[in-house]
Structure formats: structure tokens, C-alpha cells
Amino acid sequence: MLTLYSETFPSRLLLGTAAYPTPEILKQSVRTARPAMITVSLRRAGCGGEAHGQGFWSLLQETGVPVLPNTAGCQSVQEAVTTAQMAREVFETDWIKLELIGDDDTLQPDVFQLVEAAEILIKDGFKVLPYCTEDLIACRRLLDAGCQALMPWAAPIGTGLGAVHAYALNVLRERLPDTPLIIDAGLGLPSQAAQVMEWGFDGVLLNTAVSRSGDPVNMARAFALAVESGRLAFEAGPVEARDKAQASTPTVGQPFWHSAEY
């Protein structure tokens, strides 16, 4: 179970709704993955090039999954705040995935503006989930601003590279043990999702890895299983890696010629 802002969700997977081949494939993918939330933007085109209209909203409602609006495409504090306020009116929710991009090539979050926008939105009653980097200090500033959960990237959006800064992500997990951390952006394979879940991250948000795959419906299922498996492995307590071999079978009753004295 995933807990965010005192609200509990049955899944640790969050799924984006952009760039699917057709609305029907999107709907099937959501139903297959059974995510905790589905993200949607007011500023992006819908499936098949259609604008976000009543039909797209109806499709999202049919899934029965809570909607997490985002501020994708925003590059200033005022732009992000205005978009969040509009999203609250349209989708009737206080949840917002706060995105504030600082570089058009890498789509890296502008953490300075992100903190400022988060402070404003939290004071306005929003439940803010900020898309951020794995920088520990920036993440602390977001927590100081009132955020109760964070969404650090694994790699730049849409790259599918997996966790490129594994050390920094593990440090972040270790130093913020009580903060829900959801890996957002850069995952391309179910194995990569399982890996970060094994490290103790609380959830994963995906879009491109599913929507642009050869079979989004089956890929959605693969990621859902990977996230669940990774979490189970973390909770089970994996064995530590060793440099020296260690037999797994008992040595009681072994032949005398195997003894050290022989």
C-alpha cells in the first residue's frame, strides 16, 4: 500500500496518459496496470492528436482511477501556479504533480523555481508531488516548503536509461527514510523499475516506457508486476553481495577427505 498525504492507495505504480496510439489502448493499459493514479496535463494534446476535451475526460473517468493533474510544459512559477489552479477546477482535485522545467534539452527540473511554486501551492491547499532531481539539498528544501512526498527522476524524461545516478538515489533514500519517494522519469524497462523498488523507493511513475512500447497493454502489465516484485524483494530483505563464495548446502556429514586436516 502506498501512502501519500495520509491517503492510502492499493498500488505503487502511477501511470501517465500521454502519447498512446489510441484512446482504447490507453484505457486497456490503465485497466491492466491498475495504477494508484493516472497523470494528465491541461497543456498537452490527447491520444491520437485530439485535444483534451469532454471525450478524453470521460475516458479517464471510465477507468475509475484517481486523476493526478500535472503542470507539464511550465517554465515559470506563475505559469505553474496558474496551471495548477486551472487543473483543480477542471479535475476537481487538490492533487497536483508539480513540474517546472529549467532546460529544454534535458527537461531537467528548475529546483529553485520548484521550491517557490511548491510553497505557494501548498499554502493554497494543494497536495503537491514535485518532479525533482535526486539532489539531496534540493529535496530537503522541497520538504521544508511543505511537500510530504517527492518525485525524483531516474534519468531525463523519455530516455529510458534507468537510474543513471544510482549512488545519489540511494543516498537520497537513506537520508530521507520517512519521506515517500516515487521515481519519476527515465525508466525504460520493467527490470529498471524493479531495481529502484528493491532499493526501497515507494513507487514508480511511468509514461513513455509504456505508451511508446510495441504493446502498451502488455508492457503496462509487465511494469505492474515488476513494481510489485521489487517491493516484495525489498520487504523480504535481500541477501548482501559477497566477494567470496559461500556454499548454500550444509557441510554436516561430508566425506572425511574434504576436511581441512586430510
Curated annotation (Swiss-Prot):
Q: Which GO terms describe its molecular function?
A: thiazole synthase activity
Q: Which organism is it from?
A: Neisseria meningitidis serogroup A / serotype 4A (strain DSM 15465 / Z2491)
GO annotations of cellular component type: cytoplasm
Q: What is its main location?
A: cytoplasm
The catalytic site is made up of: K97
Gene3D superfamilies the record matches: Aldolase class I (3.20.20.70)
Q: Where in the cell is it found?
A: Cytoplasm
Q: What is this protein called?
A: Thiazole synthase
Q: In which pathway does it act?
A: Cofactor biosynthesis; thiamine diphosphate biosynthesis
Q: Which PANTHER family match?
A: THIAZOLE SYNTHASE
Pfam families on file: ThiG (PF05690)
Alphabetic keyword roster: Cytoplasm, Schiff base, Thiamine biosynthesis, Transferase
